[in-house]
UniProtKB/Swiss-Prot annotation:
GO terms for molecular function: large ribosomal subunit rRNA binding; structural constituent of ribosome. NCBIfam families: rplN_bact. One of its GO terms (cellular component) is cytosolic large ribosomal subunit. It comes from the Bacteria. CDD domains: Ribosomal_uL14. The keyword RNA-binding applies. Keywords: Ribonucleoprotein, Ribosomal protein, RNA-binding, rRNA-binding. Transmembrane segments: none annotated. This is Large ribosomal subunit protein uL14. The keyword Protease does not apply. Binds to 23S rRNA. Forms part of two intersubunit bridges in the 70S ribosome. GO terms for biological process: translation.
């Protein structure tokens, strides 16, 4: 469950290390984002030689949340951290590698490139 001012780790090799959520996309009153949702973020920490610089405003898709998500079959899934993958304007990942597992809900949100790059889909 991601909302404004939530800090997230970056799960790709774009050069950013930490993001802060600015806005949850999908309606004017939408407060929370979960797995597979697109958010607007500010880069808070970045590597000096990366593609993404500190202070940039980027779009990202949430791939891991600490708050558990209930699946259709009744099972719950949660992760150890909040993490996101940075997207470009065509909703494709900027990085070429994805680190750590991603939730299956990312596939249902039609981010197939992220699913194919991920080492594990839970």
């Amino acid at each position: 469950m991601i909302q404004s001012f939530t800090r997230l780790a970056v799960a790709d090799n774009s050069g950013a290390k930490e993001l802060m959520c600015i806005k949850v996309l999908g309606g004017s009153k939408r407060r929370y984002a979960t797995l597979g949702d697109v958010i607007i973020c500010s880069v808070k920490k970045a590597l000096p030689n990366g593609k993404i610089k500190k202070g940039q405003v980027v779009k990202a898709v949430v791939v891991r949340t600490k708050k558990e998500v209930q699946r259709g079959n009744g099972s719950l899934i949660r992760f150890d951290e909040n993490a996101a993958v940075i997207l470009d304007n065509k909703r494709e990942p900027i990085g070429t590698r994805i680190f750590g597992p991603v939730g299956r809900e990312v596939r249902y949100a039609n981010f197939m490139k992220i699913v194919s790059l991920a080492p594990e889909v839970l």
